[in-house]
Amino acid sequence: MKSIDEYLSELYRLDVKLWVEGNATSAQDKRLRFNAPEEIITTEFIAELKERKSEIVTFLSEVQQSIHRPQETIQPVSRQQDLSLSFAQQRLWFLEQLQPGTATYNIPSAVRLKGELKIDIFEKSLNEIINRHEILRTNFILKKERPIQVISSDSSLKINQLDLQNLDAKEQEAQVIQLMTQELQKPFDLAQDLLIRVTLLKLSATEFVVFLTMHHIVSDGWSMEIFIRELATIYTAYCQQQPSPLPQLSIQYADFAMWQREWLQGEVLEQQLSYWKNKLNGTLPILQLPTDFPRARIQTFQGANQTFEISKKITEQIRTLSQTEGVTLFILLLAVLKILLYRYTGLEDIIIGSPVANRNRKEIEGLIGFFINTLVLRSNLSGNPTFREFLQEVKTTTWSAYDHQDLPFEKLVEHLHPERDLSYNPLFQVK
């Protein structure tokens, strides 16, 4: 029988989520809950979960207790001191100084709303979120030759409203696209602007389009989901003349940034760096794809999306293969992508950048802010491995990288000192 560590690791790789409910002291009396892909839930799967329930509950309870030890939690810090940027923020701030007036780091979102919209309550709800999350009323200035966060105690957002009701449907859609493009290309001033903008287009009395734009230095993909979810909750409550039902946040992003600076040093930093220096030793390859046009001397970030669909039959075959090999769909497709890149470049040493949410602490799960990190996943196709052999190598590399995801990409670049070329990302060319 597999050890509890091995068993739970296997479930994790199969995208099975486990949690414990109940306050009973006995492991047997607590409820073990799970969420898993439909194809994973078999009679054998359920039987083994029941058989190992007691040791699973005990293990998860011990992990939960260790996570919530008081000395390990992030604590609020005084706002009377200069507040440092997180490592990710500092890198983004530096890039902004190199290219002032850029809109490259804008995060856009567009939502079409149908039905009655109480605009005054909608605006009030937006401002409640800004009041709730300090990071949304934070600016970034240079003080004594280093950037710091400056939190405004009173920032108010005004919705930019445009009425398009006088246009026909075709003209409206063209105008929506044009205005959305203009909004996306409009830069923020990190030192002075509120780093969130909202534009409301009225198409009819019961149809609206909302543009929401944030600067990446205060937000990420996970944060946008939090924002939309909280907006819906608060707006619903306000429409019913009820106060916001959301609990007060125990910490803010600035607390995380200060904690990260203090925590990621000494032995912790050395342990993380040791892994990545070993994984990325030697000359790092440059993936030169056979593009139609010469590569620009400086990255312009001007690109396009190409979407395609995989048939249901092939999708099921991929799922079956991933289950057979004990890997997630992501890892299987990552291996396939690396093989495809090998085919087009002939390069055996393949590096791909992979973004991760980096929300591996309970207290930051509900915060808006710039937490995302990028992992550098390096694999080698030398020795003519079979697909299954290479797939297992990719799996090992990926999970090992997840175990060392606390080192910010910015810190990794700083310590590796890669040869810089403005036409390429410093460590990888495919993300």
Task: Mark where each language-model region is.
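Short, charged/polar, Gly/Pro-enriched secondary-structure boundary elements
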Residues: I40-T43, D154-N160
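Short beta-strand-to-loop capping motifs
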Residues: F34-E38, V111-G115, D163-N166, M214, ...
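Non-catalytic accessory regions
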Residues: M1-H68, I148
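His-Asp-centered acyl/peptidyl-transfer active-site segments
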Residues: R79, Q99-I107, E134-I135, K144, ...
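A generic structural signal for beta-strand entry/edge sites
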Residues: A24-R33, K144-I148, S156, A205-V209, ...
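Acyl-group handoff/entry surfaces in thioester-processing enzymes
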Residues: V57-S61, P70-K158, L167-W263, E267, ...
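DNA breakage-rejoining catalytic core of tyrosine-based enzymes
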Residues: F301-T315
